């Protein structure tokens, strides 16, 4: 699925890219983002080039962690609901803290992606 994402491409450089999001599974929601934000703490430290991954500080000689899909916080409307995701309906407003696109947290997930799975 084609999505758009906020990408940190280098220290202090941000761009907007088209990316490939994974196909939604039965436990997933597809969300059209309306608001997303970059935190001054965690995400700011990645953008400034101070972190390598998760809570690991960058040190001279480490590979740069760029490019990376940033984020872990977003608000949007549900576009589609997986068969094993009870309690949600298309059109619901939701807050989500992650999506299934690899990003700032190694094998965890990123957030500034729309539509987001």
Where is each model-derived feature located?
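Residue-level signal for short segments within beta-strands and strand-turn junctions
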Residues: 7-9, 48
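Conserved hydrophobic/aromatic beta-strand scaffold that supports enzyme active sites
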Residues: 16-18, 75-77, 93, 107, ...
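Extreme N-terminal starter segment of soluble prokaryotic enzymes
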Residues: 2-4
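Glycine-rich beta-strand-centered segment in the early N-terminal region that forms part
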Residues: 22-38, 46-101
């Amino acid at each position: 699925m084609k999505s758009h994402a906020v990408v940190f491409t280098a220290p202090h450089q941000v761009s907007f890219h088209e990316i490939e999001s994974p196909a939604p599974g039965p436990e997933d929601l597809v969300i059209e983002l309306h608001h997303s934000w970059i935190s001054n703490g965690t995400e700011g430290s990645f953008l400034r080039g101070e972190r390598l991954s998760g809570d690991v500080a960058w040190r001279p000689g480490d590979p740069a962690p760029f490019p990376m899909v940033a984020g872990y916080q977003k608000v949007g409307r549900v576009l589609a609901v997986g068969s094993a995701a009870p309690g949600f309906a298309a059109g619901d407003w939701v807050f989500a803290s992650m999506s299934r696109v690899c990003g700032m947290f190694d094998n965890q997930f990123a957030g500034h992606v729309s539509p987001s799975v």
